Amino acid sequence: FKKKKKRVLVEKPATLNSTQALSIKNEYMEIDSFFTEAFMYLYHPKIKKVIELIKSGEVGDLIAMESFFGNDILTKKSFFGYKKRKKLNIKNRLYNKEMGGGAILDLGCYPISFSTLIASLNSKINYDNIVIFNKQKEIGSTGVDLDSYVGLKFENNFTSKIGVSFTKNLGKQTKIIGTKGELVIHDTWTSENSEIVIKKNNKTEIINIIGNQNIYSHEIETISQCIIEKKKEVDYPGLTIDQTIGNMKIIDKWLS
């Protein structure tokens, strides 16, 4: 890619650690080309609407959020209805450490990227000063995490509680809490159509967001336009390489 100066959209997570992400930055700075990490949810109209609502002061000053992504993919039912956990197949990338397996790398990168995006709406964030707390991990037989939780505290005192799992149906909900109310997204990551629930002053308002197209289409259209316009970075709220590096630093600490 470097020799041919290819423009790159790479599936998440872009790398397995922040050191690899930094090396990509150095290489792409040399050839002055386009690179971004693929998080399709960031380009969906619901995320743009959430950003708009927060910036307009709909829920006041941001205090905290909680964000989850988890499905029980390891429990199987027998013919008689008994539940049994599946054996981990190390040939499956999800359960292979060298192939980037585990819930943190496969799913955790979603709520991490969203947490840093939302925190940055309060004030500019310094990734090196984000404090990690309440780390919890269940490690499976192949050495990868299966059920993991973490808390983030930013310099602006904004906090985020994150949970990801291969063993529990945590769902895909995000709740963002402000001084005047809260926003709830029931399916943050994958739905084409979605709802944003605003709760404030003992009232509930539901905003329906119609995707009108495949969830990946928003991402492809935005990035294609950036490339046509010869931009070196993707349009907001897509991730720059520096944001990818910063998010991977958080994941490094979570995995450690």
Label every PLM stretch briefly.
Residues I210-E221, L239:
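Active-site loop of classical SDR/Rossmann-like NAD(P)-dependent oxidoreductases
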Residues F1-L42:
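Beta-strand-loop-alpha-helix segment that lines the small-molecule cofactor/substrate pocket
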Residues T174, E192-N201:
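Short polybasic amphipathic segments
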Residues H44-D128:
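Predominantly a Rossmann-like dinucleotide-binding segment in NAD(P)-dependent oxidoreductases
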Residues A21, I47, P111-S115, N193, ...:
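A general structural signal for well-ordered alpha-helical segments in protein cores
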